[in-house]
Amino acid sequence: MSEKHPGPLVVEGKLTDAERMKLESNYLRGTIAEDLNDGLTGGFKGDNFLLIRFHGMYQQDDRDIRAERAEQKLEPRHAMLLRCRLPGGVITTKQWQAIDKFAGENTIYGSIRLTNRQTFQFHGILKKNVKPVHQMLHSVGLDALATANDMNRNVLCTSNPYESQLHAEAYEWAKKISEHLLPRTRAYAEIWLDQEKVATTDEEPILGQTYLPRKFKTTVVIPPQNDIDLHANDMNFVAIAENGKLVGFNLLVGGGLSIEHGNKKTYARTASEFGYLPLEHTLAVAEAVVTTQRDWGNRTDRKNAKTKYTLERVGVETFKAEVERRAGIKFEPIRPYEFTGRGDRIGWVKGIDDNWHLTLFIENGRILDYPGRPLKTGLLEIAKIHKGDFRITANQNLIIAGVPESEKAKIEKIAKESGLMNAVTPQRENSMACVSFPTCPLAMAEAERFLPSFIDNIDNLMAKHGVSDEHIVMRVTGCPNGCGRAMLAEVGLVGKAPGRYNLHLGGNRMGTRIPRMYKENITEPEILASLDELIGRWAKEREAGEGFGDFTVRAGIIRPVLDPARDLWD
């Protein structure tokens, strides 16, 4: 064994309270149904506060008015975030019309938020509208099962590959993996869809009675696009094609970005290559990875419970051998693959079937009618006439997919009139933020509300140094949990306190290297001053085609993170 830190396969010790909660929940039922009828509070109480996450919801409140309400002796304005399960981000126009109506009529904020996990969220659902939202989703063939908490979350799939045929095949696998790893409990159907309690005993053959130790994220990726940021995910199937046809996958396991400020036992980690598998073994291997993590993941410390930590504790080879044993296969050597970028191709792209795909840039993924830019109304109008489907991308954008030549002009006219095709700089197209304030309870600094004006300033710096036609992959995340995927950016800002961020440099354009902290706890003017100097140097000193992140490493501005489990904090 050449492992650096082989440790115990199972961590002994006192289990976390989350483990007690799951065990006592009667397969995720808890007392959610009773709590729904409690009109004294706008929120869910006790264990239910966490159990609703397994049903795709987070309880939040509006932090902009929290102090004011406390002064008035009122409880926080509780409202739920709901995240839909949408493998591969594909949504029909009929489904879109239904979610548009619900967002407008039944949420506080009236918006649809596209996320970088290729689905949509509603923010601001009051308790009385919680059951109706699940029933609305069900009526159009959608659900929110397992999009949060200790399960396999929404499965991602490259949205707009160069080979349309490959997308169809890869997308089918994303759906199959998602379905295969879903919880089997009937709690969701009983509570939200009023389905009868059946006398049979619940069983969870894959996830187990206490589900997974921590969240688990899966992707299907079609090189050379890495739009789904595979290294942020626990389990990744990299599509290998021969003559444009999918033949199998390379498996990479153990990526993840979440850290805790100052806690050196936490680290972001890129995924490890396990090997190649033919298509027919895909579901067996997916199940084997999940059950190995189920059995070996750390249930005594939630900050050390993700797959990345299990791999480092037991060793990559040990984990891989166990997956092979459980799946009954031997991995073949990794097949060659490479990534060239991860941005979306904004605008019209022709597919191989003579249909067109229109990728619309949606800043921060927030779909709402703004003054002079009625984005939400425009998309609704397109949904009413478009015969194909919509695809949400992992960059929080939206693709109008499968447009015949004869419909192009009509759809483009609506898109332009609604501000959906306004020209933006390459820099803005390659920047991203998580939601953060006012709804996220974990937020330490602004992200979504900060990004637009911050990018205005970056655009000015790019123009000043003569590189306006270039871009730097730039991301802002409001806290170190890392939903904005700043820990795979060339320039990553991680929220530390209101108005203050840690500045990370040295990632790359392809998303295969973790950036290192360059400056800690600094303000926007300090960030801009640093970037002004560094962008100026990059513009003058870079080699042909050299991205900003690679330049900062080559020029010795920042040391590259080579082995994140051991050198991220050095």
From Swiss-Prot:
The keyword Metal-binding applies. Its cofactor is siroheme; [4Fe-4S] cluster. Binds 1 siroheme per subunit. Coiled coil: none annotated. SUPFAM superfamilies: Nitrite and sulphite reductase 4Fe-4S domain-like, Nitrite/Sulfite reductase N-terminal domain-like. InterPro entries: CysI (IPR011786), NiRdtase/SiRdtase_haem-b_fer (IPR005117), Nit/Sulf_reduc_fer-like_dom_sf (IPR036136), NO2/SO3_Rdtase_4Fe4S_dom (IPR006067), NO2/SO3_Rdtase_4Fe4S_prot (IPR045169), NO2/SO3_Rdtase_4Fe4S_sf (IPR045854), NO2/SO3_Rdtase_FeS/sirohaem_BS (IPR006066). Keywords: 4Fe-4S, Amino-acid biosynthesis, Cysteine biosynthesis, Heme, Iron, Iron-sulfur, Metal-binding, NADP, Oxidoreductase. GO terms for biological process: cysteine biosynthetic process; hydrogen sulfide biosynthetic process; sulfate assimilation. Siroheme binds at C483. Pathway: Sulfur metabolism; hydrogen sulfide biosynthesis; hydrogen sulfide from sulfite (NADPH route): step 1/1. GO terms for molecular function: 4 iron, 4 sulfur cluster binding; heme binding; metal ion binding; NADP binding; sulfite reductase (ferredoxin) activity; sulfite reductase (NADPH) activity. One of its GO terms (cellular component) is sulfite reductase complex (NADPH). It catalyses: hydrogen sulfide + 3 NADP(+) + 3 H2O = sulfite + 3 NADPH + 4 H(+). Component of the sulfite reductase complex that catalyzes the 6-electron reduction of sulfite to sulfide. This is one of several activities required for the biosynthesis of L-cysteine from sulfate. Alpha(8)-beta(8). The alpha component is a flavoprotein, the beta component is a hemoprotein. PANTHER family: SULFITE REDUCTASE [NADPH] SUBUNIT BETA, SULFITE REDUCTASE [NADPH] SUBUNIT BETA-RELATED. This is Sulfite reductase [NADPH] hemoprotein beta-component. It comes from Escherichia coli O6:H1 (strain CFT073 / ATCC 700928 / UPEC).
